């Protein structure tokens, strides 16, 4: 979603410029199945997942995602790209991926929100609360309810500068 508007590329460029971390020159699209092929220590550190329609994974994909988040120490950044239904589907998916881990709301003073005076919401498709899933004191999944990818896209979806700047900051954190 929003790949044609360069949302992923813009976020990658912002991240490289503002953190000094080495990044790929361009974003990579990967399926959940492809995550299984990465050995421990070589998988992507973070996967961005967005959508607005149906979200369904096979049992094998659910197991792959569980392994990516726990054994391979990956992180999932999920962004509700357009519907209350996607919100429910994502939470249901996470109950299957991490059945013993309940989502927690992320307070504004949490380190993942460092440098942001407010939670940036472009469109509140999934409400106005961010959630995280924590395993062994590490955030393994972060859910953003408000279409952050639109703010990363070319033109920033017309949202005010403070909002899209905070969206980049959140993506970088």
Indicate residue ranges for each PLM-predicted region:
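Surface-exposed patches in mature extracellular/periplasmic domains of secreted proteins
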Residues: 21-34, 78-82, 101-109
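Extracytoplasmic/secreted envelope proteins and their assembly/folding machinery
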Residues: 8-12, 62-66, 87-91, 171
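Aromatic-Pro/Gly-enriched surface loop or interdomain linker
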Residues: 1-46, 50-54, 148-149, 155-173
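Alpha-helical scaffolding within the catalytic cores
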Residues: 28-36, 58-64, 125-129
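Structural recognition of the beta-strand scaffold that forms the well-ordered cores
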Residues: 45-49, 75-79, 102-105, 140-144
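Short alpha-beta junction capping motif
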Residues: 46-87
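An acidic, glycine-rich "communication" segment
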Residues: 84-172
């Amino acid at each position: 979603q929003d790949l044609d508007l360069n949302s992923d590329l813009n976020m990658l460029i912002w991240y490289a410029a503002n953190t000094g971390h080495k990044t790929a020159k361009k974003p990579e699209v990967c399926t959940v199945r492809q995550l299984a092929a990465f050995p421990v220590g070589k998988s992507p550190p973070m996967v961005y997942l967005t959508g607005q329609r149906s979200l369904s994974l096979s049992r094998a994909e659910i197991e792959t995602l569980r392994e990516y988040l726990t054994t391979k120490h990956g992180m999932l950044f999920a962004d509700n790209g357009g519907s209350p239904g996607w919100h429910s589907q994502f939470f249901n998916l996470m109950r299957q991926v991490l059945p013993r881990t309940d989502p927690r709301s992320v307070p504004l003073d949490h380190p993942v929100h460092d440098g942001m005076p407010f939670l940036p919401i472009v469109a509140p498709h999934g409400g106005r609360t961010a959630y995280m899933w924590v395993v062994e004191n590490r955030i393994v999944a972060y859910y953003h309810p408000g279409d952050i990818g639109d703010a990363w896209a070319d033109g920033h979806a017309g949202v005010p500068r403070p909002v899209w700047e905070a969206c980049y900051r959140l993506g970088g954190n």
